[in-house]
């Protein structure tokens, strides 16, 4: 018998009628199922025993043969073979159809494969199949074409005229005949020739048709097989019929559908035998077509076949589709035996690798092990009595239970399992009660809390499974978060509070200033209460006297030997940093021991501190009232300005929001200072927030500051701020406003959780086959990673960005010019810091985006495995990890919105350009005009370039200068010397920079900082000027985009008319006139304002500042365009944004990008509601490029402006597809990674870039063929880029011309459906469509990914399941005994060793497993012996 693991691939094809008959064990002729009296299957019916096999094991239908010894005998009386009843799950039957019927998948799906082959539309096919029109099969000399449709009258006329030569048909027969006459080879050749002759054919249908023809040619399928003569009947056990109480039957819907087919087929046979009139026969044939269609795919039809209770029947297709379908319900998700679930409670006494297992559960879960053990120890004579003993819960059962459970790891899982840390292994410790005990530090990984959460427990049974659980899944091996390499096991809540208390310092506490010689003395002093835990004392530590506190001394005792003495107050963030540091320096074993000790100390001292919160602890800042009054005055002032018409209503609104945001921040500061002073810095509310144990600044602000601004349900901010806090109590109106946000939070949570889950599912689907498959793909390509800045603030340092990557080039020390880090060095945290110290701000590294591995990815491109901080191993399923890392925070974030209770966080708008250090203004670029106040104003977009002033000297004070103007200096380089009183001092550079020598002034300047400046910005500095830190370089209007007059003159309106496209409003409050440009659909107006010779195009929503004929001066604002009102930014905006990016959707108002470098020419042309601009290239060889921009959109460029390729020409969001087409793949990579990261960064979530890169790489795997050359591709065909390269190499070797293609970006869903594996695609979405396509192409699934292997029940090809590990032969003895004793004296040592083994390699593990296979019996005997020895002890 073949082993189920022995096949390498699965092919899907169309079945020919002969093949269907080969499968079949007999024809089903009757629609009957079972006899209602005898309850036995009817002969020749849908459950017939003769066809499908016997219902009782080893017994025929009539009972003549009743025993296994007649195996294989066919009964001469009833014709049933004596066999196992299991064959009823595999034997098929068939129905011979009286007339051919078209398969619904091939004619109804879009695009219709049948239609493409015959060059007919679905409606034309339908009219032939449903007997409305005839189709010409052989036109003879009639002048008509084959495949044309004619009606009945025409048909008879042609028959009379041309006799038997003219052939036309109707119904399935005709379609079958047409398909059979297609010569696939010849047709494909003709179309290819056509495409080459015409070169550019826009009709996509031709390419589609060629694709289908070639699919049939290459797969060996015949087109006429899409029309069925024989329908297969699936085995009866797969469409069962069960008796319910009360004598009724429940049956699968398929039986009803089959019965309809058989009934209609039999009726048709009778009608044909009786030579019934054509009209009746045709009607019956049409009904048969309907019935077979409904059987295969009922949901595809407009009028579905309904069963009892008007419910649509589930057809064969419906059984595969959707969440409840075969793929997702039964093949990808199965129920697990030996599992249980219970409520969890906290187990502070547990070690990190332990969980508390209730005895009741253990008894049930380990039943077979206990039974075997009872029999082995002769406490029970046989298995049956052992079982009875367990059920009676005898005393000796519990003794045995202890030994059975002892070294047997179990898996704990909490739903939803959003990332791999949602399932971890622990060693069980038996506990009383019914609740599972969980270690408090693993809660974060599971996202568990103890408010009624439940967890599931699973028992690994096989020795191999136990070994793998032990070496890979035990909790000490899962200390780090795979998303970012940070510890996920950090202490929270009570523990943090205890550690904060323990390590803090109090002034003037008892015993302050005392000296001690060591820890023992200090502990004695604490016991005798001569010194307090938080007093400042001096202690002799490692030969030095240090100032510290007893608490810190105690804390440092639990730190590993050799770790630096920690002498500061620790909050949650600091503690986490220490854990990360210890992990990197000492490994997981020591870290785990330390974690347990920190947990012990934390709980102990939180108990000693024993904080409680009362209403008096919530201190309101005394300055609050004054600050609120000031704010009210400022708001009034803004109202005043608005009434006078100085600012618009929108500007006023934004100003008010900004005033309240600032006031709220000031009140918060004051309140925190107040709390800090209270109770010597130990106000419980303050301590909880400051230590990071619970609560945040945001929440305490609402308790003791002011609640601040709230958001409407729409997300807009209500300008009426809530001035009260919860301590004072809210007014009625304030309370009412508050309720919006609170509800929105809860509603969002419910809706978004589902969205985040769906995002994760799509991410997993696209990246599940990315597995580390080789060590190095050898690519020369790489990416450049640099510091991430927002303005001038560094958000992500270089060391953080390049952590865990391989360098792609040699890194040289700029001073000594020696290679410090050669190419292909793995960058650890320490190395990253060194690279940063060398003065690099960007370096080239290897990246998943540029990996050339055909299947999966290589170690060098992927870099470090973030969960273990070692290079990723071959077999690591990095795609799935990437998907989980991106998807998991999505769900988290959506759940986190409601904690703030809807308080809006408005971002304060900057009004000035400034830099946070002294700097030199290098140059000011742009068109500047002088306004009425004498200030210089930018009339077009420009830039200000500044350099940081690092050092400044007067050369006269220096004795020697060794550098010249413009020279580059590295950090620490000597560039001058100065004679001091006695010796010569050498002067070195503080930072890398460039030398500027002007006269006697020597400056060292940082790199150019380019500040983009918008129109209307007022300049506050000059070229060559030194500007102090945080002083304004320029000032702008943050709320509006403006247009500035470049000359003085008279306003002339062109295509602007009040009442048509200009709305004239009078503001009711201020009586000012507002002129707003509105959209005008009917007339093609191109609104412009002309001043002198300059024209300014006016977009929709612009507010005109002057009327027609008004005089303007140079630098006046002609019109303003209000920028969109700020909505609050939270992941509610963020999750859809991530979704949009990964699905590569084109944004609604995408901006237009310049396709080449050149000058703008604007002739004012209008074509089809669009303005036409031209870009004139520099070189005369290039042609000018035409750009169409919708009327009403704000254009960013004007006549004569110079643009670069990829520059934005109008307002709007970037379209990723445009970026790919114009700027290329690397710009797109950068755009997608940075945009996704921005959303997560806003929420404070850290995800390593490489995870996003893995997904983006999978989105860019396809190429669209633009010119097929001599390859087998078709134009417009989408092919895998590796396949594209392989085919091109083949053609070039044969001397042909290769194909040309452009990379194409596919969204998650599209890319998943286009994977090479049809199994993976079919189980994702659009199951029938995928299978239809795969069957026609005769696709073979090579089972390379994880998903397809799970579906067919193979081991997944990752980790220890990789093919290369399956055939390992081992020739040496078993290495020692694997029974480890964790509860012995050397417990901690053992645990350290166990955890040190954390980065156990998959290869090692597989060897162990293989060795175990070799000698499993021996191992069991050995284990038994060792158990006996235990008993002797």
From Swiss-Prot:
CDD domains: RNAP_beta'_C (cd02655), RNAP_beta'_N (cd01609)
Record GO cellular component, one term: DNA-directed RNA polymerase complex
MF terms (GO), sorted A to Z: DNA binding; DNA-directed RNA polymerase activity; magnesium ion binding; zinc ion binding
Annotated cofactor note: Binds 1 Mg(2+) ion per subunit.
Binding site for Zn(2+) 2: 777, 851, 858, 861
Any GO BP: DNA-templated transcription
Family: Belongs to the RNA polymerase beta' chain family.
Protein name: DNA-directed RNA polymerase subunit beta'
Organism for this UniProt entry: Leptospira biflexa serovar Patoc (strain Patoc 1 / ATCC 23582 / Paris)
């Amino acid at each position: 018998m073949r082993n189920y693991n022995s096949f390498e691939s699965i092919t899907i094809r169309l079945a020919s009628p002969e093949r269907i008959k080969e499968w079949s064990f007999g024809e089903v002729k009757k629609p009957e199922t079972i006899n209602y009296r005898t309850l036995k299957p009817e002969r020749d019916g849908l459950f017939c025993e003769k066809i499908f096999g016997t219902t009782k094991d080893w017994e025929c239908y009539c009972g003549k043969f009743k025993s296994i010894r007649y195996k294989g005998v066919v009964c001469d009386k009833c014709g049933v073979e004596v066999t196992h009843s299991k064959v009823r799950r595999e034997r098929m039957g068939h129905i011979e159809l009286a007339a051919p019927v078209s398969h619904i998948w091939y004619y109804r799906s879009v695009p219709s494969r049948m239609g493409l082959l015959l060059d007919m539309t679905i409606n034309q096919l339908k009219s032939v199949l449903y007997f409305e029109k005839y189709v010409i099969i052989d036109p003879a000399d009639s002048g008509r074409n084959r495949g044309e449709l004619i009606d009945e009258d025409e048909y008879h006329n042609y028959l009379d005229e041309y006799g038997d030569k003219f052939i036309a048909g109707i119904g399935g027969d005709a379609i079958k005949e047409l398909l059979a006459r297609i010569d696939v080879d010849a047709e494909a050749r003709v179309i290819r020739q056509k495409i080459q002759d015409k070169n550019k054919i826009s009709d996509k249908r031709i390419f589609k048709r060629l694709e289908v023809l070639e699919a049939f040619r290459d797969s060996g399928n015949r087109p006429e097989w899409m029309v069925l003569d024989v329908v297969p009947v699936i085995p009866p056990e797969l469409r069962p019929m069960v008796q319910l109480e009360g004598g009724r039957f429940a049956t699968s819907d398929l039986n009803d559908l089959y019965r309809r087919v058989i009934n209609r087929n039999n009726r048709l046979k009778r009608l044909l035998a009786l030579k019934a009139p054509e009209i009746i026969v045709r009607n019956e044939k049409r009904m048969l077509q309907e019935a077979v269609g409904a059987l295969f795919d009922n949901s595809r039809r407009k009028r579905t076949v309904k069963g009892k209770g008007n419910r649509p029947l589930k057809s064969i297709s419906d059984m595969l589709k959707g969440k409840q379908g075969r793929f997702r319900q039964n093949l990808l998700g199965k129920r697990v035996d030996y599992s249980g679930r219970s409520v969890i409670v906290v187990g502070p006494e547990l070690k990190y690798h332990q969980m508390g297992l209730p005895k009741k559960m253990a008894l049930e879960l380990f039943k077979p092990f206990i039974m075997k053990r009872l029999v082995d120890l002769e406490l029970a004579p046989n298995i049956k009595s052992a079982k009875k003993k367990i059920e009676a819960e005898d005393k000796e059962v519990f003794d045995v239970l202890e030994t059975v459970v002892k070294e047997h790891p179990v898996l704990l899982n909490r739903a939803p399992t959003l990332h791999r840390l949602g399932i971890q292994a622990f060693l069980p410790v038996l506990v009383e009660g019914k609740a599972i005990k969980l270690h408090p530090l693993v809660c974060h990984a599971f996202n568990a809390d103890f408010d009624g959460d439940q967890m599931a427990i699973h028992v690994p049974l096989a020795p191999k499974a136990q070994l793998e659980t032990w070496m890979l899944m035990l909790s000490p091996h899962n200390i780090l978060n795979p998303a970012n390499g940070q510890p996920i096991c950090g202490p929270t809540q009570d523990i943090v509070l205890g550690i904060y208390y323990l390590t803090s310092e109090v002034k003037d506490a008892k015993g302050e200033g005392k000296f001690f010689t060591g820890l023992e003395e200090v502990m004695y002093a604490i016991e005798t209460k001569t010194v307090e835990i938080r007093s400042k004392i001096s202690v002799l530590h490692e030969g030095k006297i240090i100032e510290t506190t007893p608490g810190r001394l105690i804390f440092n005792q639990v730190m590993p030997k050799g770790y630096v003495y920690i002498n500061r107050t620790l909050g949650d963030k600091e503690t986490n940093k220490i854990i990360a540091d210890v992990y990197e320096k000492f490994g997981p074993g020591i870290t785990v021991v330390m974690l347990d000790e920190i947990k012990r100390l934390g709980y102990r001292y939180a108990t000693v501190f024993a904080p409680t919160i009362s209403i008096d602890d919530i201190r309101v800042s005394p300055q609050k009232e004054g600050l609120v009054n000031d704010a009210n005055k400022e708001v009034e002032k803004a109202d005043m300005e608005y009434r006078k018409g100085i600012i618009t209503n929108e500007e006023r609104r934004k100003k008010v929001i900004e005033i309240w945001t600032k006031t709220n921040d000031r009140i918060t500061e004051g309140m925190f200072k107040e709390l800090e002073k209270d109770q010597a810095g130990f106000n419980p509310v303050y301590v909880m927030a400051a230590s990071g144990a619970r609560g945040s600044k945001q929440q305490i602000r609402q308790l003791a500051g002011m609640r601040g601004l709230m958001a409407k349900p729409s997300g807009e901010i209500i300008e009426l701020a809530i001035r009260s806090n919860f301590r004072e109590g809210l007014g009625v109106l304030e309370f009412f406003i508050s309720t919006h946000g609170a509800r929105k939070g809860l509603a969002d949570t419910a809706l978004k959780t589902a969205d985040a889950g769906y995002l994760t599912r799509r991410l997993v689907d696209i990246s599940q086959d990315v597995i580390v498959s080789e060590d190095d793909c050898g690519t020369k390509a790489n990416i450049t990673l640099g510091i991430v800045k927002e303005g001038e603030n560094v958000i992500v340092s270089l060391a953080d960005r390049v952590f865990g990557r391989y360098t792609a080039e040699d890194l040289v020390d700029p001073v000594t010019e020696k290679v410090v880090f050669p190419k292909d060095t793995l960058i650890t945290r320490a190395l990253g810091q060194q690279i940063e110290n060398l003065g690099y701000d960007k370096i080239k590294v290897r990246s998943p985006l540029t990996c050339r591995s055909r299947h999966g990815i290589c170690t060098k491109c992927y870099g470090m495995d973030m969960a273990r901080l070692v290079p990723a191993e071959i077999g690591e399923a990095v795609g799935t990890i990437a998907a989980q890392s991106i998807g998991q925070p999505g769900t988290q974030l959506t759940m986190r919105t409601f904690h703030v209770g809807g308080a809006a966080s408005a971002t304060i708008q900057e009004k000035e350009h400034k830099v946070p250090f002294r700097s030199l203004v290098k140059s000011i670029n742009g068109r500047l005009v002088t306004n009425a106040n004498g200030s210089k104003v930018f009339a077009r977009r420009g830039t200000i370039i500044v350099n940081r002033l690092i050092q400044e000297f007067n050369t006269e004070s220096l004795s020697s200068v060794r550098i010249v103007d413009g020279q580059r200096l590295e950090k620490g380089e000597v560039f001058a010397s100065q004679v001091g009183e006695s010796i010569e001092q050498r002067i070195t550079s503080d930072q890398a920079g460039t030398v500027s020598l002007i006269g006697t002034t020597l400056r060292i300047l940082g790199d150019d900082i380019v500040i983009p400046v918008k129109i209307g910005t007022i300049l506050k500095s000059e070229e060559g000027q030194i500007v102090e830190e945080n002083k304004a370089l320029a000032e702008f209007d943050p709320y509006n985009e403006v247009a500035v007059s470049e000359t003085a003159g008279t306003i002339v309106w062109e295509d602007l008319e009040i009442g048509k496209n200009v709305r004239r409003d009078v503001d009711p409050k201020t009586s000012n006139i507002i002129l707003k440009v509105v959209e005008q659909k009917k007339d093609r107006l191109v609104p412009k304002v002309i001043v002198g010779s300059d024209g300014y195009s006016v977009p929709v929503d612009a507010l005109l500042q002057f009327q027609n004929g008004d005089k303007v001066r140079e630098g006046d604002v002609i019109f303003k365009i209000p920028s969109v009102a700020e909505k609050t930014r939270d992941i509610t905006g963020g999750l859809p944004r991530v979704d949009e990016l990964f699905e590569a959707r084109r944004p609604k108002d995408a901006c237009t990008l310049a396709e080449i470098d050149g000058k703008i020419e604007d002739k004012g042309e209008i074509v089809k509601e669009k303005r036409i601009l031209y870009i004139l290239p520099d070189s005369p060889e290039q042609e000018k490029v035409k750009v169409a921009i919708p009327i009403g959109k704000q254009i960013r460029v004007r006549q004569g402006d110079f643009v670069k390729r990829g520059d934005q020409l109008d307002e709007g969001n970037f379209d990723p597809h445009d970026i790919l087409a114009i700027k290329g793949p690397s710009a797109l990579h950068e755009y997608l990674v940075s945009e996704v990261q921005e959303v997560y960064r806003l929420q404070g979530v850290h995800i390593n870039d490489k995870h996003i890169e893995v997904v983006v790489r999978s989105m860019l795997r396809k190429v669209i063929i633009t010119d097929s050359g001599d390859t087998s591709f078709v134009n417009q065909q989408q092919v895998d880029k590796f396949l594209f390269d392989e085919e091109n190499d083949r053609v070039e070797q044969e001397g042909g011309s290769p194909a040309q293609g452009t990379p194409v970006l596919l969204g998650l869903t599209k890319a998943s459906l286009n994977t090479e594996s049809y199994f993976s695609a079919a189980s994702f979405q659009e199951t029938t469509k995928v299978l239809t396509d795969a069957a026609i192409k005769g696709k073979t699934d090579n089972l390379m990914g994880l998903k397809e292997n799970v579906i067919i029940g193979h081991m997944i090809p990752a980790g220890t399941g990789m093919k290369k590990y399956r055939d390992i032969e081992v020739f040496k003895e078993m290495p020692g005994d694997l029974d480890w004793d964790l509860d012995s004296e050397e417990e901690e040592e053992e645990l350290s060793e166990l955890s040190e083994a954390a980065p156990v390699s998959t290869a090692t593990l597989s060897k162990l497993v293989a060795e175990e296979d070799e000698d499993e019996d021996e191992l069991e005997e050995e284990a038994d012996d060792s158990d006996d020895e235990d008993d002797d002890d």
